[in-house]
Amino acid sequence: MGIKVKFPFEYTRFEKARIIGARALQIAMGAPVLIETDKTEPLEIALEEFNRGVIPITVRRRRNEFVWLERYDLF
């Protein structure tokens, strides 16, 4: 199973790049934007969404056990 860790925690630079890149691709392919913004570039929008903590994603890290990182809170 694993351990669930809630925010605050630090993503690695690789996790951050993967999350923002994947979200930017989704936005470029027509996915709805999760925030109100004036920006038009998918990468800039994804970065702003990441900084606000609204991207619904769970990161799975491999340590001695699996660690699940959840940053968003939808409810």
Curated annotation (Swiss-Prot):
GO cellular component, as recorded: cytoplasm; DNA-directed RNA polymerase complex
Catalytic activity entry: RNA(n) + a ribonucleoside 5'-triphosphate = RNA(n+1) + diphosphate
Subcellular location: Cytoplasm
EC number(s) reported in the record: 2.7.7.6
Principal location listed in the UniProt entry: cytoplasm
Sample GO molecular function, one term: DNA binding
BP-aspect Gene Ontology terms: transcription by RNA polymerase I; transcription by RNA polymerase II; tRNA transcription by RNA polymerase III
Sections of the chain in a coiled coil: none
Cross-referenced Pfam families: RNA_pol_Rpb6
Keywords: Cytoplasm, DNA-directed RNA polymerase, Nucleotidyltransferase, Transcription, Transferase
Family of the protein in this entry: Belongs to the archaeal Rpo6/eukaryotic RPB6 RNA polymerase subunit family.
Function according to Swiss-Prot or TrEMBL: DNA-dependent RNA polymerase (RNAP) catalyzes the transcription of DNA into RNA using the four ribonucleoside triphosphates as substrates.
Subunit relationships: Part of the RNA polymerase complex.
Protein name, per record: DNA-directed RNA polymerase subunit Rpo6
Organism: Archaeoglobus fulgidus (strain ATCC 49558 / DSM 4304 / JCM 9628 / NBRC 100126 / VC-16)
Name of encoding gene: rpo6
